[in-house]
Design a protein with these regions (language model features):
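Membrane-integrated ABC transporters
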Residues: 1-49, 63, 67-75, 93, ...
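Long, charged/polar-rich coiled-coil alpha-helical scaffolds that serve as structural arms
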Residues: 12-15, 74-80, 84, 88, ...
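Residues within membrane-spanning alpha-helices of integral membrane proteins
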Residues: 39, 55, 76-80
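Juxtamembrane helix-loop junctions of ABC transporter transmembrane domains
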Residues: 52, 56, 83-125, 129
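Short, flexible helix-adjacent loops and helix caps
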Residues: 64-68, 121, 170
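ABC ATP-binding cassette signature C-motif
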Residues: 87, 153-155, 167
Length: 172
């Protein structure tokens, strides 16, 4: 093979939306709280970043308008309390989702192992089957594997979409 020849990657069997639908169905069947907590965490995080974004303009408007010191300190204190509350709520929700996500991951491992134990003996000798089994098993083995990263990615995507919507609403 020459340098100019491109090696084609095999096309994935399933697309992102099919994988998302599958993970949501597994989560809904095993731990219904996981998708709901992912959305709640995204809303909470977007609210926190919105409050962080609005604190400077609020304080500066108080300073520019010559508001009394009590109002200025009240605005700073109000935003501080709001940020503390939202940070604590986000932290709490993030820890709540950990148990559900682990349950979903265990269900995925159970399905992978069930597939392996119920397969034909010939497949157990097939190198391609064993590699696919190992790949699926590795995807669910720990908190940093893709079976767990799925939820973090979708939380981040939802947070960014909500934040973008808030930003657009503030600009209009």
């Amino acid at each position: 093979m020459g340098k100019n020849e491109k090696t084609k990657k095999p096309k994935p069997k399933y697309n992102v939306w099919q994988n998302t639908a599958y993970m949501l169905s597994v989560a809904w069947d095993t731990r219904r709280s996981v998708p709901l907590l992912v959305v709640l965490l995204a809303v909470c995080t977007a609210g926190k970043t919105t409050a962080e974004m609005l604190i400077s303009p609020a304080v500066l408007s108080k300073l520019e308008s010559g508001a009394p010191l009590g109002q200025l300190l009240g605005a700073i204190g109000g935003f501080t309390i709001l940020l503390f509350a939202l940070t604590a709520l986000c932290y709490y929700i993030d820890h709540l989702t950990m148990f559900g996500r682990t349950g979903v991951r265990m269900e995925l491992l159970k399905r992978i192992n069930t597939k392996r134990t119920r397969t034909s003996y010939v497949n157990l000798l097939d190198e391609a089957f064993r590699l696919m089994y190992q790949k699926g098993h590795d995807a669910c083995m720990n908190n940093r594997a893709s079976g767990e990263a799925f939820w973090k990615s979708w939380t981040d995507l939802l947070t960014n979409l909500i934040g973008f919507g808030v930003y657009l609403a503030l600009l209009s």
